[in-house]
């Protein structure tokens, strides 16, 4: 994806507020207050990254903020510096509403120092009251332990909240102003591919862009692509992409010449779709200056079925490759591309990528397998039921689990940590199977792999409900291993040409997490995103910034971090979330 330049990156603004009384009070606090700001900046600049791998940049106000004039000067500087979220820090009393961040669209947090010499907690409470009264929700950060006035260390509980806020806030700011590109329209009546502009504009601050799938066909026919890159890609594909089982009847199988043409077309489709999203300067040198610009798309969706796939190769290869962290150009950040133009799953993939820097798995929530059903079909009885996540398209090849952590365990890494060796192992453990003719008459190549077990994943999904708006579902759990013969039997009766993840959610014994069946039964749509790691708490924080209520999750209550104003909407966390989101409304409305 085209990278942001150093000058226009989203930055995190640090606002050191102070007691404005001169002639002794303010002067005695300057050093401590500035040190707090510097320590927060240092923490964030060594722990939070942009998705292109570089560490986040922080901007500290030119002076401490003791009143409205300095608050306004800080706001002006932050506008010039492209600050997208702010953290206010103070060890002392300050003048509440005179010193707060008043920007209605920027996520904001306040860290009030827990010390006895000066009332940092009192300012924190006063400022938060002002934020709530003005309808500008802010996050409260206050350590559990009293610190000495000269202690420059950030306590672990404070660090956790600062980092969670920063990850979520940076995601909010980074997607604002970008585009979602619909390539095609509604796929097979799937609700997620009925693109809802109000959701994108009012909740995410994003544009909607549209091109007909014929634009891909036009570029194929008129050779509007970089032929040198196509040649490189085809050579790379020949070396690293191995064909898998062909389950089609003999009359529907393609010969070697036809398969070569198929490979050439799907490679070109991949390059063309990327160019549609983010542009390609090389096209300008070919006298296609308009096409060279792209659509400023941070995410996209490809309709495919059925208007394209009944006649032309499906998008499985391009979706899988673009969503992965590796191709013929080497290791790079993934491009977010949803199969069947499921725009809501695309946003889930975008959230997961922005929070982690990692590639995402797009999947159908295909089958709940109970213990009895597995035993009846295979003769083997598992410890519990599990869910089969499988889809022909947008599962990143990183989902094989062929990356390794420091202990040698299977994992998924952010692009900046992926090695060439790990990327190649993902390819070695993937086969490209000819598309099933009955589904895809135009042919295609689907990735076939099995996700290794023992990897923590967070399954999540945004759904739109008329009269309510968007809601978010979250289920943290793990991939599991099945005995090879059991996997083969279950996979072959489903679709052995597609990628599979066997998933077990973490159960609570209550509600939607009473058992594995309940998770599947309460899922709100046919698709989900699987993000590596247990990131439900980060998703909850992100959703609260956008005013999207969470209808289902298995995250521990102690890890739920939302704006302090939510506390005014009752004591039940789920209910207060709905009431607060309804009260404050979409972030950009």
From Swiss-Prot:
<keyword id="KW-0413">Isomerase</keyword>
<protein>
    <recommendedName>
        <fullName>L-fucose isomerase</fullName>
        <ecNumber>5.3.1.25</ecNumber>
    </recommendedName>
</protein>
<keyword id="KW-0464">Manganese</keyword>
<dbReference type="InterPro" id="IPR038392">
    <property type="entry name" value="Fucose_isomerase_dom2_sf"/>
</dbReference>
<feature type="binding site">
    <location>
        <position position="527"/>
    </location>
    <ligand>
        <name>Mn(2+)</name>
    </ligand>
</feature>
<comment type="pathway">
    <text>Carbohydrate degradation; L-fucose degradation; L-lactaldehyde and glycerone phosphate from L-fucose: step 1/3.</text>
</comment>
<dbReference type="Pfam" id="PF07882">
    <property type="entry name" value="Fucose_iso_N2"/>
</dbReference>
<dbReference type="Pfam" id="PF07881">
    <property type="entry name" value="Fucose_iso_N1"/>
</dbReference>
<dbReference type="GO" id="GO:0042355">
    <property type="term" value="P:L-fucose catabolic process"/>
</dbReference>
<feature type="binding site">
    <location>
        <position position="364"/>
    </location>
    <ligand>
        <name>Mn(2+)</name>
    </ligand>
</feature>
<dbReference type="GO" id="GO:0008736">
    <property type="term" value="F:L-fucose isomerase activity"/>
</dbReference>
<dbReference type="GO" id="GO:0030145">
    <property type="term" value="F:manganese ion binding"/>
</dbReference>
<keyword id="KW-0963">Cytoplasm</keyword>
<comment type="function">
    <text>Converts the aldose L-fucose into the corresponding ketose L-fuculose.</text>
</comment>
<dbReference type="InterPro" id="IPR009015">
    <property type="entry name" value="Fucose_isomerase_N/cen_sf"/>
</dbReference>
<dbReference type="InterPro" id="IPR038393">
    <property type="entry name" value="Fuc_iso_dom3_sf"/>
</dbReference>
<dbReference type="InterPro" id="IPR038391">
    <property type="entry name" value="Fucose_iso_dom1_sf"/>
</dbReference>
<dbReference type="Pfam" id="PF02952">
    <property type="entry name" value="Fucose_iso_C"/>
</dbReference>
<dbReference type="InterPro" id="IPR004216">
    <property type="entry name" value="Fuc/Ara_isomerase_C"/>
</dbReference>
<dbReference type="GO" id="GO:0005737">
    <property type="term" value="C:cytoplasm"/>
</dbReference>
<feature type="binding site">
    <location>
        <position position="340"/>
    </location>
    <ligand>
        <name>Mn(2+)</name>
    </ligand>
</feature>
<dbReference type="InterPro" id="IPR012888">
    <property type="entry name" value="Fucose_iso_N1"/>
</dbReference>
<dbReference type="InterPro" id="IPR015888">
    <property type="entry name" value="Fuc_isomerase_C"/>
</dbReference>
<keyword id="KW-0119">Carbohydrate metabolism</keyword>
<dbReference type="InterPro" id="IPR012889">
    <property type="entry name" value="Fucose_isomerase_N2"/>
</dbReference>
<comment type="similarity">
    <text>Belongs to the L-fucose isomerase family.</text>
</comment>
<keyword id="KW-0479">Metal-binding</keyword>
<dbReference type="GO" id="GO:0008790">
    <property type="term" value="F:arabinose isomerase activity"/>
</dbReference>
<feature type="active site" description="Proton acceptor">
    <location>
        <position position="340"/>
    </location>
</feature>
<dbReference type="InterPro" id="IPR005763">
    <property type="entry name" value="Fucose_isomerase"/>
</dbReference>
<dbReference type="GO" id="GO:0019571">
    <property type="term" value="P:D-arabinose catabolic process"/>
</dbReference>
<keyword id="KW-0294">Fucose metabolism</keyword>
<feature type="active site" description="Proton acceptor">
    <location>
        <position position="364"/>
    </location>
</feature>
């Amino acid at each position: 994806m085209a990278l942001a330049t150093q000058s226009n990156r989203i930055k995190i603004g640090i606002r050191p507020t102070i007691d404005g009384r001169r002639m002794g009070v303010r002067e005695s606090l300057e050093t401590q207050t500035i040190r707090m700001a510097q320590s927060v900046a240092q923490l964030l600049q060594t722990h939070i990254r942009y998705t292109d791998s570089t560490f986040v940049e922080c901007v500290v106000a030119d002076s401490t903020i003791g009143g409205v004039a300095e608050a306004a000067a800080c706001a002006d500087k932050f506008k010039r510096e492209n600050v997208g979220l702010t953290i206010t820090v103070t060890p002392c009393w300050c003048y509440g509403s005179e010193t707060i961040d008043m920007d209605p669209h920027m996520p904001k947090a306040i860290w009030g120092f827990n010390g006895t010499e000066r009332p940092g907690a009192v300012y924190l409470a006063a400022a938060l009251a002002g934020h709530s009264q003005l309808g500008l929700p802010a996050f409260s950060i206050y350590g559990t332990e009293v610190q000495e006035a000269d202690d420059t260390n950030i306590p672990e509980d404070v660090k956790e909240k600062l980092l969670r806020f920063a990850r979520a806030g940076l995601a909010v700011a980074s997607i604002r102003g970008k585009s979602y590109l619909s390539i095609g329209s509604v796929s097979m009546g799937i609700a997620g591919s009925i693109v809802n502009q109000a959701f994108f504009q009012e909740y995410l601050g994003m544009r909607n862009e549209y091109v007909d799938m014929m634009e891909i066909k036009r570029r194929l026919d008129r050779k509007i692509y970089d032929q040198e890159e196509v040649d490189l890609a085809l050579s790379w594909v020949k070396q690293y992409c191995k064909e898998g089982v062909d389950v089609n009847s003999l009359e529907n199988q393609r010969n070697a010449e036809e398969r070569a043409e198929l490979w050439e077309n799907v490679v070109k489709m991949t390059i063309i779709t990327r160019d549609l999203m983010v542009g390609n300067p090389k096209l300008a040198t070919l006298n296609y200056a308009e096409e060279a610009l792209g659509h400023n798309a941070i995410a996209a969706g490809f309709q495919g079925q059925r208007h394209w796939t009944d006649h032309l190769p499906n998008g499985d290869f391009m979706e899988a490759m673009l969503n992965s962290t590796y191709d013929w150009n080497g290791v790079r950040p993934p491009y977010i591309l949803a199969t069947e133009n499921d725009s809501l799953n695309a946003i889930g993939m975008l959230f997961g990528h922005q929070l982690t820097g990692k590639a995402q798995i797009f999947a159908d929530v295909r089958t709940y397998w109970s213990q009895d059903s597995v035993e009846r079909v295979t003769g083997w009885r598992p410890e519990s039921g599990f869910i089969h996540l499988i889809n022909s398209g947008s599962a990143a090849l990183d989902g094989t689990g062929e990356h390794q952590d420091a202990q040698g365990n299977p994992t998924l890494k952010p692009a900046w940590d992926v090695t060439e060796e790990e990327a190649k192992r993902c390819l070695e453990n993937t086969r490209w199977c000819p598309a099933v003719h009955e589904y895809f008459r135009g042919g295609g190549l689907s990735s076939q792999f099995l996700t290794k077990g023992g990897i923590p994943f967070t399954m999540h999904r945004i759904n739109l409900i008329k009269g309510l708006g968007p809601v978010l579902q979250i289920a943290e759990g793990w991939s599991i291993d099945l005995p090879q013969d059991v996997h083969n039997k279950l996979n072959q009766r489903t679709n052995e040409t597609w990628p599979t993840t066997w998933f077990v959610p973490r159960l609570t014994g209550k509600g939607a997490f009473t058992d594995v069946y309940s998770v599947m039964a309460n899922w709100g749509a046919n698709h989900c995103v699987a993000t590596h790691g247990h990131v439900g708490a980060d998703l909850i924080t992100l959703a609260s910034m956008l005013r999207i209520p969470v209808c289902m999750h298995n995250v521990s209550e102690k890890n739920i971090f939302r704006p302090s104003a939510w506390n005014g909407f009752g004591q039940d966390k789920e209910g207060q979330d709905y009431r607060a989101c309804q009260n404050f409304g979409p972030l950009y409305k």
